[in-house]
Amino acid sequence: MVRKMKLPFLNKNTSSSSFSSNSSSSSSSWPWPSSHQQNLKTISSKASFIVNKPKDVYEPEPPPRSFSSSPSSSSYSSFSSTSHAIENPPEIESIENVIKGLKSSKRLIFERRGTSNSILEEATKRDDHEEEEDGLMLLSLESNDPYTDFKNSMEKMVEVHVLHHDWISLEKLLFWFLKVNVKASHRYIFAAFVDLVLNLAVGPSKDVAGEPNSDVVVEDSLSSSWPVSLYSSSDENSSTSVRFLPETSIGEKGRDVCCLSSLFELEEKIKDNIDPNDYVSS
């Protein structure tokens, strides 16, 4: 009796051949292309696009020509004018011409109010203008003899405004001298004012006709021998004297008896910034 022996390698070849035949039949029967073929096709199309792209960018196709008369001529003229404007741009306007145009159109207004742009200068000019409106003009001088200068200036004011018997006006005069001068000059002002009042009380006074007083020494306040100075030194030999030059006659004439009030009380009132018009001697 003969037995059939099963050989494994024979079965393997048979199965492999059958698998290959099945795969070939399945591949032939599959209607869609494989992914490998699709990828190859996509890459090739991209490569062709990359190759053709520079040609499309750097070599533009010429515009189509039209045989009509008016539209073609207008389009050609516009194209030529645009190209001419690009090739020849307008010249940039210079800075000097721009500034001249702004000045002519009054957009830039240049005002020079003084020698500098200092706020203190404007405040000083404003104060001087107010003092001129009140009938007085402030003059600052650097003097080597402040007592004599203060006394002569006070005598000038008394002589011009006829303040011989008007004690209220004399007190206002002393008030303004103390106000506009530094504290180091107050002792010279007090001494000059006391001597002025004593001379007015003892010496012959001015009559109604307007005859000058023989005891009053008048000196021109605008003498050029003193240099003009804004600030004064605290030295005893040199101080700044500030005078009032008369412009219009102020005050009222009277024949009240002169009496010297407390000068120290008046100085305290000056420190408290009291208006001299409200101050009346007791």
Curated annotation (Swiss-Prot):
Pfam families: Ovate. Residues 139-199 form the OVATE domain. Expressed in roots and shoots. Residues 36-47 have a biased composition (Polar residues). Residues 15-35, 66-85 have a biased composition (Low complexity). Residues 1-85 are annotated as: Disordered. GO terms for cellular component: nucleus. The keyword Nucleus applies. It is found in: Nucleus. Transcriptional repressor that regulates multiple aspects of plant growth and development through the regulation of BEL1-LIKE (BLH) and KNOX TALE (KNAT) homeodomain transcription factors. PANTHER family: TRANSCRIPTION REPRESSOR OFP18, TRANSCRIPTION REPRESSOR OFP7-RELATED. Plants over-expressing OFP18 show small rosette size, late flowering, reduced fertilization and blunt-end siliques. This is Transcription repressor OFP18. It comes from Arabidopsis thaliana.
